[in-house]
């Protein structure tokens, strides 16, 4: 669960150019929720994403992840929990590197070995399958420099990269589970430690029995040992609370209408399949209605409408235009 609590942000404070970007804004986004955000220029949309990602800090208020205050967490540490796609397709990829190299770096983001792009056969096949799902032919262009791809291909690749990250170590999973658990931290620590110890002891016992197995070949023992570890690993990864939150900052605005539609369809597919908590800024009212479970409307640094469920499904572009007109008239 993501909470934006009583956030105020003022730019150029105390000068003739003073601008209140956010005025005591609060909202909560539940796990797996897909929120579209609309509003005019300077209404506070991008400032909200900048504060969530840690690019800038609020003057007042804060950001909470599963009720844990991360307001003062640095941008690089917060990158484990937030992934962002910008309007410019060139921002999300390294143009002088190959498609597969870009994916490899994204796949190691936040990992203990840092950045790098060593790729084994298994990873290469995994990347090909991921790219195949984009239906853009990129699975056949693994060694192509991203700089020569079309804007749509590059943005689709950026979107895929944003959802990738290195699998956290077991130690990191246990630590984050305690940190971000909603209830009593000590109970959470005892619970996850018990699960880990029991699963690890079971894995050790199975591998010891495997060594004593006389009728099994070395190859079969190796294969079985890998299967035992996979079962152990899956038990621990059930406690991983750090699935990334996706921040989309007008990520189709620089694309032609046909390509933008394709990228939006891919966005919907990726978000739903991975159950990603997502906030998507758009100036396209039709897209704001079509996509997502919930719509938030900003005006002059405030949230003036927060629409979800059946109410959102019944929305029309005319409804949204009327809401904007009402907001403007209220200030006259």
Label for each model-derived stretch:
Residues 302-325:
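Conserved beta-strand-loop-alpha-helix hinge in the C-terminal portion
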Residues 1, 10-24, 74:
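A short, flexible loop at the N-terminus of ABC-type nucleotide-binding domains that lies
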Residues 261-273:
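Helical segment within the ABC ATPase nucleotide-binding domain
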Residues 53:
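Helix-to-loop junction immediately C-terminal to a conserved catalytic motif
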């Amino acid at each position: 669960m993501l909470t934006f609590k009583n956030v105020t942000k003022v730019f150029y404070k105390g000068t003739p150019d003073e601008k209140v970007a956010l005025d005591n804004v609060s909202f909560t986004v539940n796990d797996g929720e897909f929120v579209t955000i609309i509003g005019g220029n300077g209404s506070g949309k991008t400032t909200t994403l900048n504060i969530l990602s840690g690019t800038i800090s609020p003057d007042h208020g804060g950001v909470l992840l599963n009720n844990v205050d991360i307001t003062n967490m640095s941008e690089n540490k917060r990158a484990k929990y937030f992934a962002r796609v910008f309007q410019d397709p060139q921002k999300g990829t390294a143009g002088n590197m190959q498609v597969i190299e870009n994916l490899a770096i994204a796949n190691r983001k936040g990992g203990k070995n840092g950045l790098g792009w060593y790729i084994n056969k298994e990873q290469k096949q995994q990347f090909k399958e991921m790219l195949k799902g984009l239906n853009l032919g990129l699975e056949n262009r693994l060694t192509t420099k991203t700089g020569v791809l079309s804007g749509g291909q590059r943005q689709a690749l950026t979107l895929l990269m944003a959802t990738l990250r290195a699998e956290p170590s077991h130690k990191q999973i246990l630590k984050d589970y305690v940190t971000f658990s909603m209830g009593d931290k000590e109970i959470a620590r005892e619970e996850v430690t018990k699960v880990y110890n029991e699963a690890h002891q079971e894995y050790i016992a199975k591998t010891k029995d495997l060594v004593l197995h006389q009728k099994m070949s070395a190859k079969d023992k190796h294969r079985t040992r890998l299967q035992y570890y996979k079962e152990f690993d899956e038990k621990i990864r059930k406690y991983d609370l750090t699935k990334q939150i996706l921040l989309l900052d007008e990520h189709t605005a620089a694309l032609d209408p046909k390509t933008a539609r394709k990228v939006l369809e891919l966005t919907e597919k990726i978000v739903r399949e991975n159950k990603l908590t997502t906030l998507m800024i758009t100036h396209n009212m039709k897209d704001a209605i079509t996509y997502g479970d919930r719509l938030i409307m900003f005006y002059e640094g405030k949230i003036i409408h927060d629409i979800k469920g059946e109410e959102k499904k019944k929305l029309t572009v005319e409804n949204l235009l009327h809401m904007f007109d009402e907001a403007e008239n209220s200030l006259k």
